[in-house]
Regions:
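Adenosine-phosphate binding glycine-rich loop
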Residues: 10-13, 251-351
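Rossmann-like adenosine-cofactor binding region
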Residues: 197-285, 290
Length: 351
């Protein structure tokens, strides 16, 4: 028999803070680059096309002595049964023994690590003095993408939010953005007053909704796309030199958020080359022959380690295609398990 810890959603949220998650996700990227982490093939299955599906992302972090998986299912008719449409969990196992260490609610892990990825993309590829952030999408990920970027980019003065389907939703988000960001993310830093005040000051900026995506694109220094779109929202001719894109939404075949022609003039970076050309934002550009796999400059871990330069000049357009990899989930989940054990949170069963 061995102990197996199960951690509910509330406890997961209690144990995570964005600054630490950014550090964890960066470490996952660098472990992958150093061949101390690897991904297993994705599993995707539709139970009923357009109505119910599931996917499994898994991997092995030899540098952290863990392996595991994240399973996410989507059953579109669940809300009518008083059940969530999206359900997920992360399981972590010891790679030296194969013994499961624990599992937890997947939603807060996914939201935090996905937000972190967008902010990390800005950190390594955007111009350091960037002031204007455009967020395309005002859904569940919006606050996470903004907070991570405010942590990694200290000169942001304005956040513009665009929702392709509803200006009202973008406006509603912006109206309460400052309060929401403070409530969701600042509590863990109250014991570090200097950091708390720094982040509070970064949150106290301008938040503006827009229904003019062309103008917003023309003005943006950093653009984060976090939508389920299946067609381009941003066109190449709108993008000024020096713009950085963190593309978050395209995580399966068929999704697309930016004009594929942007890839012909941009420096392109990804979290995982195989995933990017098969399910990511990069897929369409490769599929249409606009670029090849070899045109991808590097995976982000190489840039973090200083092996590959990111931006070469202030005029470069940079694209970071973040498809989302299991290593992000696993390294975050392992951190949660360690913290939960310290604080005696969760339920421990003997298996």
């Amino acid at each position: 028999m061995f102990p197996f810890r199960v951690i509910d959603q509330a406890s997961v949220k209690q144990l995570l803070d964005m600054k630490h998650v950014i550090e964890l996700v960066e470490r996952a990227y660098t472990l992958k680059e150093q061949k101390e982490a690897s991904l297993f093939p994705m599993v995707f299955h539709e139970f009923a096309p357009g109505k119910a599906d599931m996917d499994i992302k898994s991997g092995h972090l030899t540098g952290a002595d863990i392996f595991g998986l994240k399973l996410v299912s989507w059953f579109g008719e669940n809300p009518a049964k008083d059940l969530p449409a999206l359900v997920g969990f992360v399981m972590v196992l010891d790679s030296n023994t194969g013994v499961p260490k624990g599992m937890m609610s997947g939603e807060p892990v996914t939201l935090m690590r996905t937000g972190a990825a967008g902010g990390i993309g800005a950190k390594y590829f955007a111009r350091p003095e960037s002031e204007n952030l455009l967020l395309v999408g005002s859904g569940h990920l919006a606050a996470y993408e903004i907070m991570a970027t405010l942590i990694t980019m200290k000169h942001i003065k304005k956040v513009t939010v665009y929702n392709a389907n509803s200006y009202e939703k973008a406006a509603t988000f912006c109206a309460t953005a400052k309060e929401k960001l403070q409530e969701m993310f600042l509590a863990p830093y109250r014991d570090d007053q200097e950091l708390y005040r720094t982040l509070l000051d970064r949150i106290e900026i301008e938040y503006v909704a827009t229904d003019d995506i062309r103008q917003a694109t023309e003005e943006a220094d950093i653009i984060i796309t976090a939508t389920p779109s299946h067609k381009p929202i941003i066109m190449k001719e709108w993008v000024k030199p020096g713009t950085h894109f963190s593309c978050i939404g395209a995580d399966m075949a068929g999704k697309q958020e930016i004009d594929e022609n942007l890839f012909t003039t941009a420096r392109v970076f990804v979290d995982d080359v195989t995933q990017a050309i098969n399910v990511g934002e990069t897929k369409v550009a490769v599929q249409k022959g606009l670029i090849s796999k070899e045109d991808i400059v590097a995976e982000i871990g190489s840039v973090i380690l200083g092996r590959t330069p990111g931006r070469l000049s202030d005029q470069d357009i940079t694209i970071y295609d973040s498809t989302g990899i299991a290593l992000q989930d696993l390294i975050t989940a392992d951190y949660i398990l360690k913290k939960a054990e310290e604080r005696e949170l969760g339920t421990v069963a003997q298996l």
